[in-house]
Amino acid sequence: MNMRTYTNITYEKNRDIIQLMHILSNPNTSIEIYRNTFYKLGKALGALLDEKKHSRYGNTMLACASEDADWLAQGVLSSISQKNVALAVFWNQRITLDETTKLEYSPIVKSYIEPIEECQTLIVVKSIISSSCVVKTQLTRLVEKMNPLNIYILSPVMYKDAQKNLQKEFPESISNKFEFLTFAIDTSKDAQGSVLPGVGGM
């Protein structure tokens, strides 16, 4: 049985966001609607972040994978009150090291990173956080170059163990800065390791 728990939203106040989540998990959703749905969810995540930050960001960088740059990340950028944001975009390759345990490695094969001085807020945006390997690789690259005061990890959907597993990959001096913002926690995966209902098989 595929179990999903909604967080940061309620059926009474956020039916529009829940409807967007249903659209994402529908395998018959068209590409155009799928992309537009990610943009709208990005805007909603950005609005949630603004509530947390009270518009006090300081020097800010947004990091994302290349496949999330045009839709989800753009939605976040359009919604947050901080408009001067440095960008970091990564192209990752996913390599499965162990088929049995679904252990994965995600090396960066290309990156675009804008300069930033004294980063205070690092925002990492991902369409879904499952094994955390992509986010881990991106964060490792960035925290080596800078020492942000706050790290916000935004994703519409997260697998139930993703937060714990990502935190274990970093020393407490880094992981204590993490704050995760999501709308749904999923508890199931299929035989291929895809989160269910997830975001349509991604």
Regions found by a protein language model. Give the residues of each.
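PRPP-associated nucleotide enzymes
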Residues: M1-M202
